[in-house]
Amino acid sequence: MRFKFPLMAISLEVAMIVLFGLFVEYETPQNASQKNASHQNASQQGNTSSSAKKDQFFQLYPLFQDVHVMIFVGFGFLMTFLKKYGFSGVGFNLFLAALGLQWGTIMQGLLHSHGKEFHFGIYNMINADFSTATVLISFGAVLGKTSPIQMLIMTILEIAVFAGNEYLVTELFEASDTGASMTIHAFGAYFGLAVAGVLYRPGLRCEHPNDESVYHSDLFAMIGTLFLWIFWPSFNSAIADPGDHQYRAIVNTYMSLAACVITAYALSSLVERRGRLDMVHIQNATLAGGVAVGTCADMEIPLYAAMTIGSIAGIISVLGYKFFSPLLANKLMIHDTCGVHNLHGLPGVFGGLASIVAISWGMSTASMAMQAAALGSSIGSAIVGGLLTGLILKLPIWNQPPDEYCYDDSVSWKVPKFRELDNRFFQHANHNHVEHEV
C-alpha cells in the first residue's frame, strides 16, 4: 500500500487537473442564463446582468453549503459507529468525497455537454456533491472490509455508472427526481450491496470482534445523524426550480422527517426486548423520511401525504434493520455493514413508487411510465455496475485486508499507542454493545 495508493491517488489528481484544463471554464452571465433556462422565465433571460447572476449564485450558495456539510460532516460522522474504525470512517469519507466531486463534475459535465467544453457554476457544485453521495452510500455497505485502493477504484467506476444513469433519467426519460430518491439513494444502496455480495467472505459471516460499537462511537455517529437530519430539506430542494417548487421541497421534507422520527422511535421500542430503544435504529431510521420523500418533494402533494410517506419510511427502515439485514447476511451472503439497504435502498424504492402514485393523482406533469423506467434503470444499472465493480475489486492486487484485520484503523492509519480499547471492558447484561469500564 505504501507505493500503490500514493501513486494511484497522485496520478488520478493529475488526470483531473488535465481534464479540468481541457473541458471546464468559469460560468459567465451569458452561458449561465442559457444553462439555467429551466429555472428562469425566458423573457427575463435576455436582460440578465452580471450582478443578477452573482445574486443567483449567492442565493443558492447557502443551500450548497448545507449539502456540503451533509456530505463531509453528516456522512463522515455517521460512519464512526465502529469501535476501532473511526479514523477510517470519517477520514476516508473526506478522501472519497474530495475525489468524487472532481470526477463527478467531469463525468456529468461531459455527458450533458455531449463531450464538449462546459462551464462550471453553482449547479455544477451542487450536482458534484450529489454524485459523491452515491459513493458514500455504497461505502457504507463495504465499510471496514476494503482497502483504500479498492475504495478509490470503486469511486471512479461508480460515479461513471451513476453519471450515465442520471443522464438517462433526466435527459431521456425526463423523469422527476428532485431529491434523488432513485438516482442517488436507491442507486448507491444497490450498487454497494452488489459490491458487498461479490466481496463476501465466509470468515466475516459470524460476528467479528471489531464489528460492533462502544458508547462513545455511537455518540459520534449520532452527531452525523443530527447534521444530516437538520440539513436534509436543503438536499431535497437544492436543484428544485426556484419559487413554489423549492418551497414545497423544503416544507415537505421538513414534515416528512419529523413524522419519520416518531414512527422510528415507536417501532424501535416495539421490536426490541423490554421496549428499549436501539441506537442503530435511531441513528439511521430517523433519516429515512428524507430519503423517501425526495422524489416527490417538489410535487403538489398535501402535507399529510409527505408526513405519511415519512411515517411509513421510518417503519420500513426499522423493520429492515431488525429482520431484513440478518436475512441478507445469512441467506443471500450479502453483509451490509452500515445497513444502507434499510436507510437508502428500501426508502429510495418506496420514494420512487410514491412519486408514481403522486403522478397518477395529477400532482405532477411527469409521466408514470417514465417514472417507473427511471426507478428500474436506477436499480438495474446499480446492480449490474456493482457486480462488475465487485469483480474488479476482488482481484488480489488491491490489498484487501484479511479477515482478522477488518474493521481496524491500524491497517491504514497511525493510531495512538494508548487507546481506550486497550483498557479492560465489561458487558452489561442484556446489552449487545461493549462498554468501557469506569
UniProtKB/Swiss-Prot annotation:
Give a yes or no for keyword Transmembrane helix in this entry: yes
GO term, biological process aspect, one: ammonium transmembrane transport
Cytoplasmic-facing ranges? 1-4, 83-86, 143-148, 200-218, 271-278, 322-342, 394-438
Q: Could you give one GO CC term from the UniProt record?
A: ankyrin-1 complex
Keywords of this entry: Ammonia transport, Glycoprotein, Membrane, Transmembrane, Transmembrane helix, Transport
The family database entries (PANTHER family) matched by this protein are listed as:
AMMONIUM TRANSPORTER (PTHR11730), AMMONIUM TRANSPORTER RH TYPE A (PTHR11730:SF32)
UniProt protein name: Ammonium transporter Rh type A
Species the sequence originates in: Mus musculus (Mouse)
Give the gene symbol. Answer: Rhag
